[in-house]
């Protein structure tokens, strides 16, 4: 209750006094700014419930602090009321003076922003005009003076050329050039007679050229001579290439190579034409498919048909080249065509060279990204199994050849074989007696055979299982040898035991090789 008594007393003491804070808050600029801050605060507060709870807590804290400050400052305000009144009056007078000097304080923020924008744009426009107008006028003057100087120089050059041509020396020089050019034309006509097909259009062209002007100019004659020489050179080159190609096609094996070269050139042109497109994995599949199709078509077609098609293509290319050459009536056009062709070739080469590394890297990267780890591991496992199978087949073939072919020191024949005792097993007493012996005389009589067998088996197997079995039986004399059961007959026994010969490898290793293969 004491907190609300202070303002009521102040209002009772000064009922008609204006407050500076209220006037400042009522200004459009300040009120608009406060509204903007209030909207921002409300939107932030409504963004999340946690933020709203925190803001409410701070609001309550600030309200409590302000109430406490007002309650504590109430005695001071009562004692200094006269001083506060005087300061308020002075502040109100200053605010009135500011409103008179700056009327924009009474404008809304939107109006102030529009007026400020218009003022800035007009200032910038005036500054730009002040800079660009003198530059434009100066450049126009400079260009006019330059054009006038160029026209004057051209006029002087023309007058000088006409004067030099009308002099005696000029007439002699032009006559000498005309005589030399005429002699060159006669030599060219004598050495290079025109074709029958091209004689009619060339004569018609000469008639059309001679009709408007009796004597052609020197430049036109030079251009005609250059076109004639270039056309004859290209015709001669095309004929020589055609003759060489026809002769080379008679050589056996050249036709497939030429077709393969044409396919490679077409594929390279396709790659160069697609240099701006993205590098994708299906591009490789398309190239492979087109390669297979072209290869099948080429193998199906006969040699005569390919020769006829190539001759037709070459004739069409020659006609196109001749048309391009005849379409250039002046040396400027001929040189321009040559320069254009060279420039286009250089551009294609440079673009292909710059695109090739990026294409290769992009293709490799896409293949690596598109290939999963499981596919890589499965492919690797299949490759390893295939290599093991091939190795097993190779070892089996080598062992079979060594077994059947009577090579010196390689084919080992053991009459007392493991397979020989299957039908007639020995008695138990004989087994005991044989088990008490340290070693059999046959095994000691030929000590070099196991080494040779191991040497032969080193091509396929890392160890000698038969030798290990014999050493183990000799090293254990005390064990009782039980009669072995007769194994079941299999189809492969006829392959591994053609006679009493013992196979080089053991049965376990042969079974492993069969499983691998």
UniProtKB/Swiss-Prot annotation:
Pfam families: Perilipin
Biased composition (Acidic residues): 299-319
Keyword Membrane: no
The record's account of how the chain is modified after translation: Major cAMP-dependent protein kinase substrate in adipocytes, also dephosphorylated by PP1. When phosphorylated, may be maximally sensitive to HSL. When unphosphorylated, may play a role in the inhibition of lipolysis, by acting as a barrier in lipid droplet. The N-terminus is blocked.
Protein's GO biological process: cellular response to cold; lipid catabolic process; negative regulation of lipid catabolic process
A Gene Ontology cellular-component term: cytosol
Chief location bin: endoplasmic reticulum
Annotated tissue distribution: Adipocytes.
Superkingdom, natural source: Eukaryota
Cellular compartments annotated: Endoplasmic reticulum; Lipid droplet
Post-translational modification Phosphoserine, affected residues: 81, 126, 130, 132, 137, 174, 315, 385, 387, 411, 434, 436, 440, 460, 492, 494
Region ranges (Disordered): 197-217, 285-321, 415-495
Entry's transmembrane regions: none
Residue positions, PTM Phosphothreonine: 85, 224, 299, 301
Assigned keywords, A-Z: Endoplasmic reticulum, Lipid droplet, Lipid metabolism, Phosphoprotein
Residue ranges, compositional bias (Basic and acidic residues): 483-492
Presence of the UniProt keyword Lipid metabolism in the record: yes
Annotated segments matching region Required for interaction with CIDEC: 291-322
Job description of the protein: Modulator of adipocyte lipid metabolism. Coats lipid storage droplets to protect them from breakdown by hormone-sensitive lipase (HSL). Its absence may result in leanness. Plays a role in unilocular lipid droplet formation by activating CIDEC. Their interaction promotes lipid droplet enlargement and directional net neutral lipid transfer. May modulate lipolysis and triglyceride levels.
Subunit: Interacts with ABHD5. Interacts with CIDEC. Interacts with AQP7.
Family: Belongs to the perilipin family.
PANTHER family (UniProt xref): PERILIPIN-1
Descriptive protein name: Perilipin-1
Organism: Rattus norvegicus (Rat)
Lineage, highest ranks first: Eukaryota, Metazoa, Chordata, Craniata, Vertebrata
């Amino acid at each position: 209750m004491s907190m609300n008594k202070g303002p009521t007393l102040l209002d009772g003491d000064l009922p008609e006094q204006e407050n500076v804070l209220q006037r400042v808050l009522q200004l459009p600029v300040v009120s608009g700014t406060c509204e903007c801050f209030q909207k921002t605060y409300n939107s932030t507060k409504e963004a999340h419930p946690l933020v709203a709870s925190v803001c409410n807590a701070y609001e309550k804290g600030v309200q409590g602090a302000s109430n406490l400050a007002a309650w504590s400052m109430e005695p001071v305000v009562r004692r200094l009321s006269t001083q506060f009144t005087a300061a308020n009056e002075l502040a109100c007078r200053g605010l009135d003076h500011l409103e008179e000097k700056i009327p924009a304080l009474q404008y809304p923020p939107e109006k102030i922003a529009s007026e400020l924008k218009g003022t800035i744009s007009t200032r910038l426009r005036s500054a730009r005009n002040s800079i660009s107008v003198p530059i434009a006028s100066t450049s126009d003057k400079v260009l006019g003076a330059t054009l006038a100087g160029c026209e004057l120089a051209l006029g002087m050059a023309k007058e000088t050329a006409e004067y030099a041509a009308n002099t005696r020396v000029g007439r002699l020089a032009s006559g000498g050039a005309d005589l030399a050019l005429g002699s060159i034309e006669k030599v060219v006509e004598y050495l290079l007679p025109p074709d029958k097909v091209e004689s009619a259009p060339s004569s018609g062209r000469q008639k059309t050229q001679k009709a408007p002007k009796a004597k052609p100019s020197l430049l036109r004659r030079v251009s005609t001579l250059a076109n004639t020489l270039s056309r004859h050179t290209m015709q001669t080159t095309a004929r020589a290439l055609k003759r060489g190609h026809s002769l080379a096609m008679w050589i056996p094996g050249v036709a497939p190579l030429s077709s393969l070269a044409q396919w490679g050139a077409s594929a390279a042109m396709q790659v160069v034409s697609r240099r701006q497109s993205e590098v994708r994995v299906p591009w490789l599949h398309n190239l492979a498919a087109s390669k297979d199709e072209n290869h099948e078509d080429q193998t199906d077609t006969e040699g005569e048909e390919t020769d006829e098609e190539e001759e037709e293509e070459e004739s069409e290319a020659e006609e196109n080249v001749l048309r391009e050459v005849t379409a250039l009536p002046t040396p400027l056009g001929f040189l321009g065509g040559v320069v254009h062709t060279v420039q286009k070739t250089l551009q294609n080469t440079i673009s292909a060279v710059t695109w090739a590394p990026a294409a290769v890297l992009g293709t490799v990267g896409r293949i690596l990204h598109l290939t999963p780890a499981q596919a890589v591991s499965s492919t690797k496992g299949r490759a390893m199994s295939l290599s093991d199978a091939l190795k097993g087949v190779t070892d089996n073939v080598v062992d079979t050849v060594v077994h059947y072919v009577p090579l010196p020191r390689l084919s080992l024949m053991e009459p007392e074989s493991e397979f020989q005792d299957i039908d007639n097993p020995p008695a138990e007493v004989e087994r005991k007696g044989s088990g008490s012996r340290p070693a059999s005389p046959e095994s000691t009589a030929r000590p070099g055979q196991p080494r040779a067998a191991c040497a032969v088996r080193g091509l396929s197997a890392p160890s000698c299982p038969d030798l290990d079995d014999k050493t183990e039986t000799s090293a254990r004399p005390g064990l009782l040898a039980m009669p072995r059961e007769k194994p079941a007959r299999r189809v492969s026994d006829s392959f591994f035991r053609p006679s009493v010969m013992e196979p080089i490898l053991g049965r376990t290793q042969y079974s492993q090789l069969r499983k691998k293969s």
